[in-house]
Amino acid sequence: TGQLPKFEEDLFKVPGERDLYLIPTAEVPVTNFFRDVIVKEFPIMCTAYTPCFRREAGSYGKEVRGLNRLHQFDKVEIVQVQHPEKSYETLDSMVIHVASILDELELPYKILQLCGGDLSFSSALTFDFEVYSAGQERWLEVSSVSNFESYQANRLKLRYKDENGKTQLCH
């Protein structure tokens, strides 16, 4: 999914003969359900609620140590596998979905479109959601939604057959 090798230092490695890691996000196991699959029908929609593990704890600074970044946290992940022609439409609907949750919770939020320098190398377009924390007097990222286009599908060999029977990469 693009976590390795770039983010290896932020992951928890399990000691042993094989290179195993605790999951940094449910995106990793969820997308791997579709490794080497040829999709027959779109969209595929998944959600997962998992504990996640990252070494980035405390990266917000000592004034909020232990409040914003923890080594273990629970996270909800939404993943969609889509036809390339519909991937940006799907991204827009996922943005609306996350915004509707924040609206229901009546939380003040803003949506930021990340610039090229802030995107992960695997993402074509990402929107971050930030909620205002009155206690810290700052905006805190609470969600992000991305379109990876064919990046993850290429690594996963996640494909579909087009109208001519030719194998293509999903988004």
Predicted regions, residues:
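TRNA-recognition modules of translation machinery and tRNA-sensing kinases, especially anticodon-binding
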Residues: 1-171
